[in-house]
Amino acid sequence: MTARILHFLKSTREYGVVLILLTLHVVCISLPGREAKLASSNLMTNLSRLEALPKITNRTVVLAGSSITGRLLEEYFTLPDQPIHNLGLDGCGSLEALETLLTAPQLPAVVLVELNTFKPGFEKTFQQVRDAHSPRREQAAHFLPFLRSRERPLDVLYDFTRSFKKETSSNQSGHLEWNDAIRVLHPPLVGPPPPPTVKETAYLESARTTLTRLRQAGCKLAFVLIADSLFYDPWHDPNFARAAEIAAPLDIPVFDLRKATGVESLAWTDAIHLTPAAARTMAQFIEKEIIPLAQ
């Protein structure tokens, strides 16, 4: 009996050590660098998807969406005389994804640019991805099939753990009427967005250059803003104002999808996906209000 107890304590201690090491790895290594790693992975995913562009017929409108808009199924678009191919670029809100488009053999007709591209702090992630990027990593996308899947296991696991409580609340309420209660915890920012730092200014100038090059190459652009979580986003209005300021001299239209489509009253299944009904509403708005820019 004593031997069994000692063996149990020893094995338990070993399991405890392993658990502690895993926890430290997640807290100290994985999570802090996740945005840069995920953005770099998104970059390789986008490269493989861009290879499909030459196979698309001239009659097809190619929509390079981002985040939620990039996951809208093509069957949700209903206009019979305007076939849609949703390229579904990952991280299209990030500047590195926009720069990737410049290397494509054929530019998409319409690109939706997420307004959180200009959220403070993104310039750090962008620089990390740029520093880590190399031609060898681009070539790796051809040999790693999971990078070309629409949902990578890491993303699914991360978003499930991050949005478990949000999913439960969504299933219970079925919509976002309770969003007003969240504003008590996260009050909206008052006044204009804070002035950009030196790094942010350089980042925004780089974004302007990239957007200008895309426009000169014949690509139609549109800025879109959509809440990507159930929680109230205090950066919503400042993001919209900053993006509108950037878009004005470039003649880029700006759409607030949350207000235009009534997204606050639409149900979400988790942090990434819209329900089929909400997705159809989103797709129809894109068809009627955004895609005509490519005509």
Predicted regions: what they are:
Residues 221-224, 240-266, 285, 289:
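Extracellular serine-dependent O-acyl
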Residues 268-295:
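Histidine-centered active-site loop/cap adjacent to the catalytic His
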Residues 1-12:
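N-terminal Lys/Arg-rich, disordered targeting/topogenic segments
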Residues 64, 68-145:
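Membrane-embedded segments
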Residues 10-33:
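Hydrophobic membrane-insertion alpha-helices, especially the h-region
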Residues 115, 124-222:
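Secreted/periplasmic serine-hydrolase-like ester/acetyl group-modifying domain
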Residues 33-57:
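Alpha-helical transmembrane signal-anchor/signal-peptide segments
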Residues 91-94, 199-203, 229-238:
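Acidic-and-aromatic substrate-binding clefts and catalytic sites of carbohydrate-active enzymes
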